Design a protein with these regions (language model features):
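NTP/phosphate- and nucleic-acid-binding module
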Residues: 1-473
Length: 473
């Protein structure tokens, strides 16, 4: 199935019907762009996180992990500028009172314009000059001036709500790494270069979330802050671009569905020396940002050092000098990359049986490392349930295993294909034999491959090693 033939509705329907993702708070009418990961979705998303940690922490000679608090001292966000300037350009349609993001209105009507490089005043002027930019709701060109809309969720700590109790849900996980730089370097005795990786929730009060789990107000990030000596940063920037792209390719994303887009100088954040986005060809857009890799220089550590009065310098014993490290940041949205893996894996295969009847097989061709269930154990008859459950219980010590003894074997295969289970293990009467008839058990099972539908006979004792070999990436 070509990428252009896929639609977001196909992905959403599969996710809802098969327990990957449900609308949040659905019995109360839901909550806009709130999604709950169901039984299969939580296993799948956990596997995405495990795959990231495997390559970025476990196998990396440079990186260590961290799990920082979601609610931080509010001075953190004053220092970084989030309190004063982490905002979207908001305007209202005077005719119908609908509220919109100005940059989105400009970008949709004039994609040739680099809206990221425009100030709020420049956006105001551009909209005023271009009457083809109209309200998507009523079609009128009559807007209020742009105003800032801060994206942070504000809350309060303690029993009173005043300015002294104000705090925020973190809008990014990166700052928890920066404020812990000295603690991590001291306790791990790491020398530059080294990185700190974190998986965790972040929150942004987005004006226009949408496209399923692509953009939501509550999301999970997988971020690495890689600290290096100034002057070596661009080499490491290139290293991490390749490393990130290779991770995606190793888990089944096709190279032709990815592109690396370097930011133009006008797009760069003022503190950034270079930024590259790895973009994916989502079915609902031409290209959508998947992974941002940025050279943040020493901006964050310098700001925190100045505001806190605590030294965040690194002593280089080889050169006998003190300096603030530069930082390369590969930042990836877990929910967004999980959606990309689902879009990549979704397939509808048109088949014709021996009688000439046409059929459509829906298959989720997830890499086995990401699949919620690594295998499913299917007894050919319920009379074989005891042996089948014995196999299931043994394999479940090492993998997530499904068990299904309801319906024809063909229908069970199709169910497993649709949820992405890479291998189906069929227990038949040859497996257990028939002592009364003098037929010895062969202690073998039939293993069916999801992608090819090919079947092989295999000893039960070899199942674990066989599946393990397929999970590696």
């Amino acid at each position: 199935m070509e990428q252009s033939e896929k639609t977001l509705d196909m992905i959403v329907n599969l996710c809802k019907n098969r327990g990957y993702v449900f609308p949040g708070s659905e019995i109360y009418g839901g909550l806009a762009n709130s999604w709950d990961y169901g039984p299969l979705g939580v296993e799948f998303k956990n596997n995405v996180k495990k795959a990231w940690l495997k390559k970025f922490v476990q196998e990396s000679p440079y990186n260590v992990g961290l799990d920082a608090a979601i609610i931080m001292n509010p001075q953190t966000w004053v220092t970084t500028g989030h309190v004063s300037s982490f905002s979207d350009p908001l305007l209202d349609c005077r005719a119908c009172k609908a509220r919109h993001r100005a940059d989105k209105l400009i970008g949709e009507e004039h994609p040739e314009v680099n809206v990221d490089a425009m100030s709020f005043d420049e956006m105001d002027a551009f909209i005023a000059e271009h009457e083809d930019i109209v309200c998507p709701v009523c079609g009128k060109h009559d807007f209020t001036p742009i105003r800032k809309f801060n994206l942070m969720f504000k809350t309060a700590i303690g029993v009173t709500e005043d300015s002294s109790s104000t705090c925020y849900l973190r809008p990014e996980t990166a700052q928890g790494i920066f404020v812990n730089f000295a603690n991590i370097q001291r306790t791990t005795r790491r020398k530059l270069p080294f990185g700190v990786c974190q998986v965790g929730k972040a929150f942004r009060n987005e004006i226009t979330p949408g496209n399923f789990t692509f953009r939501t107000r509550e999301f999970e990030q997988m971020e690495c802050e890689f600290f290096c000596k100034p002057g070596t940063d661009l080499d490491w920037f290139a290293y991490w671009k390749d490393y990130c792209e290779n991770w995606l390719l190793s888990l089944g994303i096709k190279k032709e569905h990815l592109r690396l887009r370097d930011h133009e100088p006008a797009e760069l954040a003022f503190y950034s020396r270079a930024t590259t986005d790895i973009e994916y060809a989502f079915p609902f857009t031409d290209w959508g940002e998947l992974w941002g890799i940025a050279d943040r220089t020493n901006y964050d550590l310098t700001r925190h050092q100045e505001a806190s009065g605590k030294s965040l310098e690194y002593f280089d014993s080889e050169t006998n000098e003190h300096y603030i490290p530069y930082v390369i940041e590969p930042s990836l949205g877990c929910d967004r990359v999980a959606l990309a893996f689902l879009c990549e894996a979704y397939d509808e295969e048109h088949l014709t049986d021996s009688k000439g009847k046409e059929d459509v097989r829906t298959v989720l061709r997830l890499h086995p490392a990401l699949a919620p269930y690594k295998c499913a154990v299917l007894p050919l008859s319920k009379k074989l349930g005891e042996k089948a459950m014995e196999i299931r219980n043994e394999l479940s010590k090492y993998f997530m295993v499904d068990y299904d003894d309801t319906g024809s074997i063909g229908k069970r295969y199709r169910r497993e294909d649709e949820i992405g289970t890479p291998f189906c293990i069929t227990v038949d009467f040859d497996t257990v034999g028939d002592e009364a008839k003098g037929i010895a058990a062969d202690n073998c099972v039939t293993v069916r491959d999801r992608n090819t539908m090919e079947q092989v006979r295999m000893p039960i004792s070899e199942l674990k090693s066989y599946i393990e070999s397929k999970i590696e990436f």
